[in-house]
């Protein structure tokens, strides 16, 4: 049976449609992002940008997997589907539906008129198709528990038919909100934080702090895989990973006179080093009260290390269950739970302070006369790479 149909991908914008006068700014950035991604992935299909959606034409079977993966990751896309597009002739639509339903015993139709000039309303046209399919092919339409559901969109010159929708990440296009540096560990929280800010339009890079890198190659490889996953192998954002050798600084911090402040001082070092790269903001996976260093008192003292730097903590009020749910949604969970050597846990004292005082921190830092030089040296080495 020759159906003369063309496979297309249709992707919807989601909240971009609601942006009013600023809408064109966001949709223009989304177009740029798609063009860059297609070029990197060597996809040459033609694209039409409509008011509330994108249509990619002439989808080949071998392209579906990579396009599905890309549009699942691409911020700014709320949902998408692959569809068969045929000329708007009822006999061709019936033939396509029969070909689609022939291996099933029951079906359901959903019809949407995007072309409001179409003579029949959606409900009547759906009934008409169901009767024709039963008369010609003895196919039975049902309301409850059908084996297959076909969605039909009526366009000006074509019908679109599809059976499955895929959820996108939603949000705003990358590069529409500035550039952020994410403090990325190998755990569950920071990859989720990175994914959330990317959804809000940030172009992101990553920095991770490793002690004795030669002994932590597996950890570095794990964090690299997370960075590549979040950035879709640098296809949808910059995705650069900076690996900061923390060994010399850690050897300094081990000698402070009050070991309960170790983690607080260590995180202040992280903030100071990361802020020297002059991004629009820093992003962390900190969650209020989740661990000893993340009490409100400690977070205030840690943040005071970089008073002129904007710190974004997307997870600050989330429960662990919610963060795990998001990690699974962003596909980072499986990598995050792989075992690795963690700088914080290796360095943590038996009784970490939960109520750090800035006066005590400043006194302890004054004991470490080489600390700032070591931070600047580490930043300089990465800046010159």
From Swiss-Prot:
GO cellular component terms attached to this protein's record: cytosol
Q: What is its main location?
A: cytoplasm
**Positions of ATP binding:** 183-184, 208-209, 267, 285, 294
* THUMP domain sequence ranges: 65-165
InterPro entries with a match to the protein in the record: Rossmann-like_a/b/a_fold (IPR014729), ThiI_AANH (IPR020536), ThiI_fer (IPR054173), ThiI_N (IPR049961), THUMP_dom (IPR004114), THUMP_ThiI (IPR049962), tRNA_STrfase (IPR003720), tRNA_sulfurtransferase_ThiI (IPR050102)
User: Has keyword Nucleotidyltransferase?
Assistant: no
Q: Which Pfam families match?
A: ThiI (PF02568), ThiI_fer (PF22025), THUMP (PF02926)
Q: Carries keyword tRNA-binding?
A: yes
Question: Which Gene3D superfamilies does the entry link to?
Answer: 3.30.2130.30, HUPs
The record's annotation in HAMAP family points to: ThiI (MF_00021)
Report the function annotation for this chain. Catalyzes the ATP-dependent transfer of a sulfur to tRNA to produce 4-thiouridine in position 8 of tRNAs, which functions as a near-UV photosensor. Also catalyzes the transfer of sulfur to the sulfur carrier protein ThiS, forming ThiS-thiocarboxylate. This is a step in the synthesis of thiazole, in the thiamine biosynthesis pathway. The sulfur is donated as persulfide by IscS.
Q: Which PANTHER family match?
A: TRNA SULFURTRANSFERASE
- Name-wise, this protein is Probable tRNA sulfurtransferase
